[in-house]
Amino acid sequence: MVRNLGGVYFGSGDSNIYALDAASGSLKWKFKTGDVVHASPAISGGILFVGSWDSYFYALDAGSGREVWRFKTGEDPVIHNQVGIQSSAAVADGVVYFGCRDSKFYAVDAATGKERWSYPNKGSWVISSPAVSEGKVYFATSDSGLFHVLDAKSGTPLYSLDFKHWAFFSSPAIAGGTLYIGSHQGRLNAIDLEEQKVAWTFETDGSKKNGPAYTKDGTPNYEASFFDLFYDDMVSGVQKMLSVGAILSSPVAAGNTVYVGSTDGNVYALM
């Protein structure tokens, strides 16, 4: 959800994008997509940008809801039945950046809807939303657990960090030369953007209690953690996954403190 231009804008499981009057809550307009809308909209220059599970990314006039353009993404190259956009967009210098379940990360011209460039991610979805700062775009992947830094203008890869297949749903936050992002491992990672490495990590209480979830080299022990339980009891499997203390929400940095929530039920404030 985003508030801008006197309106409140959000997507819904009924496939609509809604615009409400911020003062009264009355409906200004709604726009029907072809599937559910999980992503939060971004607004720039009076245009609303948001993706849908119908595999299209939309640009709408924020005042009227009129479609300005739509951009068609693809399908997962491995599973082939996975499409759609969960990543919220970032807009900078006339370009819209977003990830997709077709395993690509896209840069699209904000005015025309034409692709500027795309970056493939080896069969891994990009659910995490990007951050853009000082000519660079930052995002992370799900299945492969990679954190990428690309040149925002050209899409040229600058460097990547490998988090050993621990998925990222959390989106990055940048403050004071440090980027903060959480993973399914239950760790908040502080990445020094100048040194291009992890400066420190914080482990949630749930993560500390679930040593069997990791192998000796730090990669996920899926068999011990999830698969046996999922096959026998879906409810127990989900509970086990949540108990790992994964960080699915995005951190917020304010002053000298970073705030983040976890599936272990805690909200943490770190200094």
Question: Model-derived features: where do they sit?
Answer:
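Conserved core beta-strand positions within WD40 beta-propeller blades
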Residues: 7, 47, 95-97, 136, ...
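Short loop/turn segments that connect beta-strands within beta-propeller blades
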Residues: 21-25, 61-65, 109-113, 151-155, ...
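Blade-level signature of beta-propeller repeat domains, shared across WD40, Kelch, NHL, RCC1
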Residues: 242-271
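Extracytoplasmic beta-rich repeat domains
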Residues: 1-4, 13-14, 29-44, 53, ...
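Repeat-solenoid scaffold signature
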Residues: 184-187
